[in-house]
Design a protein with these regions (language model features):
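Cyclophilin-like peptidyl-prolyl cis-trans isomerases
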Residues: 18-192
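Bacterial Sec-dependent N-terminal signal peptides
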Residues: 1-23
Length: 192
């Protein structure tokens, strides 16, 4: 009886660890192709939970990538970045802003393909997110892109479809950062 109980306990322990280590994967389906992202729930639990609230409520469906920041379309900025930004939602459907999970806490830096939350001031991120094109250390804590030096909340990484993100970034260089037509985000869903 003791051996059976011990065996069941060990089996349960192994199962719990496997479930706890399950990767959270989402697929961003766009009109130009899919972008697959892995979310780092253990490192950035607040930001991932926030993103998944929008995903699970289907609020990102039929939104868009609306902004592309390239080295050539930010002439007034002394610190240049390269990102694409999307996921802007009707203000009546936006959830409460979340606390900023700084890169010093999470250890997730703004490298090529990093998924991060857009914000104005600290603790103001809601739904809009961006994907880094190339490494962007100026978006990390103490980075110079934002005057407050607090950085942005990185919470995942593109694992497939980075070519789609780069196509979006280069679509309309003549239009500046905000472009038309926007690239439709058909849906964002969890990978089953």
């Amino acid at each position: 009886m003791k051996k059976k109980s011990l065996f069941l306990f060990v089996l349960l322990f192994v199962f719990i660890n496997i479930v706890a280590q399950k990767k959270e994967i989402c697929i961003i389906k766009t009109s130009l192709g899919d972008i697959t992202v892995e979310l780092y729930a253990k490192k950035a639990p607040i930001t991932v939970a926030n993103f998944l609230k929008y995903v699970d409520a289907h609020l990102y469906d039929n939104t868009s990538f609306f902004r592309s920041v390239t080295l050539n379309n930010q002439p007034k900025d002394s610190v240049k970045i390269e990102v694409i930004q999307g996921g802007e939602i009707d203000s009546t459907k936006v959830f409460t802003a979340i606390p900023l999970e700084r890169t010093t806490k999470t250890g997730i830096l703004h490298k090529n393909g990093t998924l991060s939350m857009a914000r104005d001031k600290p603790d103001s991120a809601t739904c809009s997110f961006f994907i880094c094109i190339n490494d962007q250390p100026s978006l990390d804590y103490k980075g110079k892109r934002n005057k407050d030096g607090q950085g942005f909340a990185a919470f995942g990484k593109v694992t497939k479809g980075m070519n789609v993100a780069k196509i979006i970034q280069q679509l309309h260089p003549e239009q500046g950062q905000y472009f038309k037509p926007e690239v439709t985000i058909l849906s964002i869903s969890r990978k089953q």
